[in-house]
């Protein structure tokens, strides 16, 4: 968690939401550049393969969501450049995010299925776990978002796919270094797992070892032939 205060601004216009949120944070000494620097540091520190963030329009116009997504689009580039925010580069090195998804982004759309029971969650779905998590977010329970998440007693929401407005399942691939999605439904499509990377690294080591053996075998055989020819 960051130390940024939970401040609020809202507008249906992205530009206005951005300006209002920027002004609110600047009033407490926090600039847009601070947002970019913080996200850049997080990327370098945690080295994610995939990053997922807010809608560029802040979903319903939430100014801080707008600030966050805008800053991220700059941070994914900054994180690769050691001269950009050099202090965090010196601490953690640089890092290139392989894929960046934004909520409700219109290009390269992807629909996630968060209603599949997951073994790691003891058969619960990702959406059910998110509902349990939001139950602890007491400061937000008075907002319209509570109904968006849970529905009503007469019509409770049991699945993420049942939410149509600001669907939690719809994203778009904003940036990729590993190609575009072909299958869909998986943020990690085209991304090699840690296990696969370890296997590839081991194969590379074996290949190098084999080449070295072959080289010395050929040299030895060549020396033997020279002796015979003499």
Residue ranges and their predicted role:
Residues 78-230:
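The feature marks non-catalytic terminal segments
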Residues 1-85, 207, 217-230:
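Active-site beta-strand->loop->alpha-helix modules in alpha/beta enzyme cores, enriched
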């Amino acid at each position: 968690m960051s130390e940024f205060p939970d401040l609020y601004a809202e507008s249906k216009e992205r530009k206005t939401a951005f300006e209002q949120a920027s002004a609110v944070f600047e009033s407490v000494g926090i600039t847009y550049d601070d947002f970019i620097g913080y996200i850049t540091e997080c990327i370098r520190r945690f080295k994610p393969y995939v990053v997922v963030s807010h809608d560029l329009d802040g979903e319903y116009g939430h100014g801080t969501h707008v600030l966050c997504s805008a800053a991220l689009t700059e941070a994914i580039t900054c994180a690769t450049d050691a001269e950009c925010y050099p202090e965090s580069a010196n601490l953690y090195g640089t890092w290139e995010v392989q894929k960046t998804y934004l909520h409700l982004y219109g290009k390269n759309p992807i629909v996630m299925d968060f209603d599949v029971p997951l073994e790691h969650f003891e058969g619960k779905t990702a959406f059910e776990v998110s509902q349990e998590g939001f139950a602890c977010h007491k400061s937000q329970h008075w907002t319209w978002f509570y109904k968006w998440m849970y529905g009503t007693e007469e019509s409770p929401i049991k699945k993420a796919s049942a939410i149509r407005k600001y669907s939690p399942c719809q994203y778009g691939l904003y940036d990729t270094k590993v190609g575009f999605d072909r299958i869909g439904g998986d943020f990690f499509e085209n991304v090699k797992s840690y296990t696969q990377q370890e296997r590839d690294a081991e194969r590379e080591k074996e290949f190098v070892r084999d080449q070295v053996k072959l080289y010395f075998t050929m040299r030895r055989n060549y020396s033997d032939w020279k002796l015979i020819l003499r």
